[in-house]
């Protein structure tokens, strides 16, 4: 696959991951139409919950406060579908953290695609390392959703789960791109060094002086490559130059 295509596909996949991970952040109570999980009339989101009775939203609260009177106003106890208490809701904080890491990775992917840093081995190595952390956080977000909401998980949560294999592909492509760019970089560096050494190791040797019939003097010089070591073979033919003087 051409490097240009790889960079373009990388930016597209990371953009899709950003969109997928943005939906859970917009769930209730920020948007009553988006639900991360539902159980016993409670609609859960990353930042809070709403209680809905017969399609009518009765109460919405940011944060999960198990000591609040409103929490137990409609049911005996506020529980997640997995029957865990709301005290474990602090695990949902991994969603905004994962989204932030993915956004930074998205910016890096755009820089790799649109600027000269796309051919910098150090920058691509940094992006590949960052992608590992972004992938692990996305995986942790999906596992937390499955742990809390089990079969009551709604489609925003499944989008997070779908972003996990996409993040794995992006991570793999970044390491592959880093390997290819590093190989090209060191090949060019080795070629430049070899070319410089080739001209730097030339030696002009005087071989002989001859006299012609008209008393002109012909001096023979040979331009040859000087080997780096005794074991190095000289494969290039010697170039002979003739100069004349009267």
From Swiss-Prot:
Family: Belongs to the palI/RIM9 family.
One family name in Pfam for this protein: SUR7
Extracellular-facing ranges: 30-91, 151-154
Subcellular compartments: Cell membrane
Transmembrane segments: 9-29, 92-112, 130-150, 155-175
Location (main, coarse): membrane
Keyword Cell membrane tagged: yes
InterPro entries documented for this protein: pH-response_reg_palI/RIM9, SUR7/Rim9-like_fungi
GO cellular component, one term: cell division site
The protein, known as: pH-response regulator protein palI/RIM9
Membrane topology according to the record: Multi-pass membrane protein
Keyword Cell membrane: yes
The entry's keywords: Cell membrane, Membrane, Transmembrane, Transmembrane helix
GO term, biological process aspect, one: ascospore formation
Domain of life: Eukaryota
Chain's role: Required for the proteolytic cleavage of the transcription factor RIM101 in response to alkaline ambient pH.
Ranges in the topological domain labelled Cytoplasmic: 1-8, 113-129, 176-246
């Amino acid at each position: 696959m051409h490097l240009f295509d790889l960079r373009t596909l990388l930016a597209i996949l990371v953009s899709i991951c950003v969109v997928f991970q943005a939906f859970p952040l917009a769930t209730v109570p920020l948007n009553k139409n988006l639900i991360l999980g539902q159980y016993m009339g409670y609609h859960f989101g990353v930042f809070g919950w709403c209680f809905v009775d017969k399609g009518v939203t009765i109460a919405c609260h940011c944060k999960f406060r198990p000591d609040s009177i409103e929490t137990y106003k409609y049911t005996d106890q506020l529980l997640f579908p997995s029957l865990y208490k709301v005290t474990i809701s602090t695990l949902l904080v991994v969603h905004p953290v994962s989204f932030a890491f993915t956004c930074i990775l998205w910016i890096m992917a755009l820089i790799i695609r649109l600027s000269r840093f796309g051919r910098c081995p150090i920058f691509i190595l940094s992006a590949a390392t960052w992608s590992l952390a972004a992938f692990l956080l996305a995986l942790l977000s999906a596992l937390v959703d499955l742990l809390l909401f089990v079969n009551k998980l709604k489609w925003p949560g499944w989008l997070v789960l779908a972003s996990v294999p996409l993040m794995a592909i992006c991570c793999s492509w970044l390491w592959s791109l880093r390997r290819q760019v590093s190989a090209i970089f060191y090949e060019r560096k080795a070629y430049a060094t070899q070319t410089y050494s080739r001209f730097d190791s030339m030696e002009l040797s005087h071989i002989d002086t001859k006299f012609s019939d008209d008393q002109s003097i012909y001096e023979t010089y040979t331009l040859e490559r000087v080997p780096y070591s005794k074991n190095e073979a000289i494969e290039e033919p010697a170039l002979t130059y003739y100069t004349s003087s009267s």
